[in-house]
Amino acid sequence: MQSKRYLVLEDGSFYEGYRLGSDNLTVGEIVFNTAMTGYQETISDPSYTGQIITFTYPLIGNYGINRDDFESLVPTLNGIVVKEASAHPSNFRQQKTLHDVLELHQIPGIAGVDTRSITRKIRQHGVLKAGFTDRKEDIDQLVKHLQQVELPKNEVEIVSTKTPYVSTGKDLSVVLVDFGKKQNIVRELNVRGCNVTVVPYTTTAEEILAMAPDGVMLSNGPGNPEVVECAIPMIQGILGKIPFFGICLGHQLFALSQGASSFKMKFGHRGANHPVKNLETGKVDITSQNHGYAIDIDSLKSTDLEVTHLALNDGTVEGLKHKTLPAFSVQYHPEANPGPSDSNYLFDDFVAMMTNFKEKERHINA
C-alpha cells in the first residue's frame, strides 16, 4: 500500500497524494513546468535550486533516468509534484527510476495529485511557498511555518563552482562564469571547438582578463539577479574588452550592469514550448525557458542596450545586444536539452563574434 503524503501551500490549501522520493521533507517556492519531456534535465537544472516543481504533463518517469542526461552532478531542487509517476519505466538507456534518483539525492515528491488545479492556482495567485508532510494532523502547523519562513536569498552561492576547472577544446578560449550553469552550455561550446574554463561567480574582471580569453559567457542560474551584486562590476570591467554572451540569469545581470532593472514575474516562464520573436529577422523560435524574473523593458530606454527578442505570450524581454560593443544575451536557453534546438545558432553567432574580434585585434596590433 502506498504511503500518504500531503502537499501544503502557504494559503492553507493542501493536496493529498502518495509518497514519492525521499522522506527528507522540505519547503520551497512552488512553480510549474509545461514541458512534455526532459524531466531528468529539469530536475538536475541548477536554476530550480530551492524550488518545488509541478509537472503539468500527467505521466513523469516513464523512460527512467540515465547517467548521461544530467545537467548537474547533484540536483538541488526541493521537491517535485506529479499526477502519475511511472513505477516501471522502459527505455534502453534507463539505469534508475525517478523514485530511486529522488531518494538518492534526498529530494521529496508527491504523486497522485491534481496538477492542473495546482497549476491554475499558481497562475491565478502567483508563486507560493509550499512544503510536504506525511501527517494530516501536521498541516495547520506547516501552514504557519510557511507563512513565516524566509527562503534563501542567494541560491547562486549554493550551486556555483568553488574552484575553476577546464573542459578542453582546441580553438577559441572561453571563460564561463558559473551562476548555476547547465552542463549542455559547456557541451555546445566544446562541440564548436572552444576551450572552456568554468570559474566561480565571484571571479573579478581583473582575474578574467588575466586569463586572456577570446570570450566570456555568463551562465544561467537560480533566483533574483539583484542579489548577485558582485557580478555587476565584473561585467562592467570586461564589457568592450572581449566578446560577451549571457544566458538567462546572465542576461539579466548584463542588463542590470548597464542600468536596467528587473522585476519578479507572477509565475514565470518554465517549459520547452515558449515562442520568442527575433525582432531583427522576424523569425519565431520555440524555446526552452526557466526564469521567474525578467527585465523591465521601460528601464532599457536610458541604456545602450537594444531589445532583440520578445516573448510572444506576454511581450517580456527575451534578448538584448549592446548598441556598439560585442555583447549580447538571451533570457531563454539556446542550449536546451533535450530541446528544442531552434536557437543553437546563437552559439555559432558567439563563435563568429569572438573570431571577428580576435581578427580585428590582430590587425590593430600588427
From Swiss-Prot:
Protein name as annotated: Carbamoyl phosphate synthase small chain
CPSase: region residues: 1-171
EC numbers for this chain: 6.3.5.5
Gene Ontology terms: biological process: 'de novo' pyrimidine nucleobase biosynthetic process; 'de novo' UMP biosynthetic process; glutamine metabolic process; L-arginine biosynthetic process
Residues of the Glutamine amidotransferase type-1 domain: 173-360
Function: Small subunit of the glutamine-dependent carbamoyl phosphate synthetase (CPSase). CPSase catalyzes the formation of carbamoyl phosphate from the ammonia moiety of glutamine, carbonate, and phosphate donated by ATP, constituting the first step of 2 biosynthetic pathways, one leading to arginine and/or urea and the other to pyrimidine nucleotides. The small subunit (glutamine amidotransferase) binds and cleaves glutamine to supply the large subunit with the substrate ammonia.
Pathway membership, UniProt: Amino-acid biosynthesis; L-arginine biosynthesis; carbamoyl phosphate from bicarbonate: step 1/1; Pyrimidine metabolism; UMP biosynthesis via de novo pathway; (S)-dihydroorotate from bicarbonate: step 1/3
Keywords of the record: Amino-acid biosynthesis, Arginine biosynthesis, ATP-binding, Glutamine amidotransferase, Ligase, Nucleotide-binding, Pyrimidine biosynthesis
Originating organism: Staphylococcus aureus (strain Mu50 / ATCC 700699)
